[in-house]
Amino acid sequence: MESREFLSKVQIPPVTQLLVWAPVENKLAYVWNYNIYLKKNATAEAVQVTHNGKVNKILNGVPDWVYEEEVFASNEAIWWSPQGKYLAYLQINDTGVHNIEYSLYGNDQYPTTVFIPYPKAGCVIPRARLFVIDVENPSRQSEVLVPKSVGVGDHYLRTVTWVTDERLAVQWLPRRQDSVLLQIYDYDGTNWKETSQKSKTGWVGRYFPAAPYFAANNMSFYKVMSNDNGYKHLHYVEAGKAKPITSGKWEVIYISKVTKDSIYYVSNEHMGRPGQRNLYNKSGHSAPECLTCSLYQDRCQYNSAYFSLNASFFRMDCYGPGLPLFTLMDNRGPAKGVLEDNKKLEKILTTELLMPTIKRATMKIAGFSTYLWYQMMFPPNFDSSKKYPLLIQVYGGPASQNTDYVFRLEWATYLCSTEKVIIASFDGRGSGFQGDELMHAIYGRLGTYEVEDQISAVRKFIEMGFIDKDRIGMWGWSYGGYVTSMVLGSGSGLFKCGIAVAPVAKWDYYDAVYTERYMHRPEENTESYKNSTVTDRAKNFKSVQYMLVHGTADDNVHFQQAAQISKALVENQVDFEAMWYTDKDHGLSGKARYHLYAHLNHFLQNYTLPK
C-alpha cells in the first residue's frame, strides 16, 4: 500500500460483498461468495477461513435480508477486536426460511425470478451463530454460545461490542423482543456476566435495544434504556444493576462518545420540544452541559456530532430548522471553523423563491390526556381569513416522529409554495421520543390508535377556520401508505382523496422481526391481525378517490401487498387509480421518482386542488 498502487482483481475478487480493514496495521477481512477471507496486508495471499457459505442458505460475515433491514441496519456482520487480534463474525442459516419470489422483467425474452429468504410473521426465522477467529491462527475458531435463557427458543443476535482484545459483549433477544440479555464473555473463562433488561409495557428499546458503551474499567457500561417512568435515559450498569444518571420527561436519543471523564449524548430535553436534538456533556457528578443549545439558536435546533478519537474535536452537524450548517468545534476552547454553510442555497431561497412557513405546536385529541405535537406548513402570504386545501403527510409507524426541526426541500415544499396547499403532520399514539406510554399505546394493535388519531387531528385542523373541509387529502409511503389506506377505509367522511405508496395490506405478509416486535405472532394475536387489514375495508373506498403506487421489485413491502389491495377493491367494485413501477424497489429511485411526483401532482390537481 505504500506504493499507492491499486489492488488487482487477483488480490481482491471483483465482486466482493464486504471488505473491512482492521483498526490497526494493514490487516483486512473480506466476504466473497458468502465466505470470509483474511489478508495480513493488502498484497498478502488471502486465507479462506469459512467454507460453508452458500447463497440463500449459509451466510458468513454478511447479514441476510431481514438482519440487514431490521436488526443491524447495516450490511456488515464482521467485527474486529481493538488491536486486530481477533475477528468476530455472524453466521446466518437461512435453510429453513421461506423464499419470497418476484420477477425482474429487464429486457430479455424471459423475465428473471428473484429468490430471497424472507421470514414473514409467524414463520421460520434465520438461525444466528457468532464465531471468533484468532487472526494469527485462522483455523482456531470458537463459538460464542447463546445464553440458555435465550437459546431455548427462537432468538436474534442484536449487537456485538469488543471491549478489549480478550473481552466481548453480545446482546441477544428472544423472538418476542420484549427483553434483551447482554452477555460479557472473556476467553480465559474467568468472567461470564449477564445483564438482562425487560420492557414493562411493550417491546424493548425504540426499534431495538441500544448498544452498550463501556467505561474505563472495561466491565461496567453506559446504555440508553427506559427508566421506571418509561422515558429513555442514560444508565450506568455495574455488576448487573442499572443506575439512571439522567432523568425527566424527555429522552436521551443516543450516546455519541464515552471518554475517561465524560459521556457525550444527544437528547430532546431543551425547551421541552421532543422534535429537537442537542448535544450534551455529562462529567462526573456535575449537571449535564448542553454544547449546542446556544449555538446558532434560530438556525440549529436539530443537531448531531461526530467526535475525534480522543474527543478533542467534534463536527457539529446542524440539520435545521434553518439551512443545514456543518461546523468543526474545538472541545477544549471556543475555536471553530465552518465547513459548509450553504450560502449559495440561502441566496437562491431568499432572492428567487417564496418559501412556506412552518408552525410547530401541540393539541389535545379525544382518547389521550397528553398534548400531542403537530406541524403545519403554510403557503407564502398565508391569509387566515381564506380557505385552503389540506394534505396530511403521514408515516405513523411505531417510534416514528414527523414533527421535528429538520430543514427539508421536498415535494411537500413545492405543493405548499406553488399550489397553495397546507401540509400538516401529526404525531399521535405510537410515535416515539416522548415516553413509552405514548409509544407503546399501539402495542399488539397496529392499525388502531395511530389511524384514529390522524382522523381526530384533521377534525382539530378544520376547527382552526382556514381549512376547506371539502378539499382534504392524505398521503404516505410504506407505513405511511398503510395508515393512509386505513384512514381512507375508515369511512370517516373527512377525506376526498388519498395516495398510498408501497403500503402494507396485511401484517401477515410483512417480515417477522418488525411485525412480531409490535404484534406478536399471528397465532398469539389473531383478532388484531384480522382487524388491521386494509383489504377488509375495501368497500369504504367507494366514497374517496384512491391512488395506489408500488414497485414490482420491492423486496421490503412486496408487490403482493398492493396486489391484494387491488384485488379487494376490484371485488368490491371500487374505482381507483394505480401506478406500478416495473423492476423498481421500495425506494422508487431514478426516473421513476420524477415520474411518481408528476403523477401525484396530476392526481391532486384532479381531486383535491380544484374548488
Segments (PLM) and residue ranges:
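Short loop/turn segments that connect beta-strands within beta-propeller blades
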Residues: E2-S3, N41-A44, V135-P138, Y187-T190, ...
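A flexible loop/linker signature enriched in serine peptidases of the S9 family
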Residues: I12-V15, V31-N41, H51-N75, L90-R127, ...
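Residue-level detector of Asp-centered blade-edge/turn motifs that repeat once per structural unit
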Residues: P23-V24, P82-Q83, T164, A216-N217, ...
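Hydrophobic beta-strand positions that form the internal "hydrophobic ladder"
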Residues: E25-L28, G84-L87, R167-V170, S220-Y222, ...
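Cap/lid segment of the alpha/beta-hydrolase catalytic domain
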Residues: E45, N52-D64, T201, K347-S478, ...
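Signature of short aromatic-glycine-proline-rich micro-motifs recurring in repeat-based ectodomains
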Residues: G61-P82, Y156-T161, R206-M219, A305
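Non-catalytic accessory segments flanking enzyme active sites
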Residues: A88-I92, V97-I100, C123-R129, L145-P147, ...
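Active-site-proximal cap/loop segments of hydrolase catalytic domains
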Residues: S425-K611
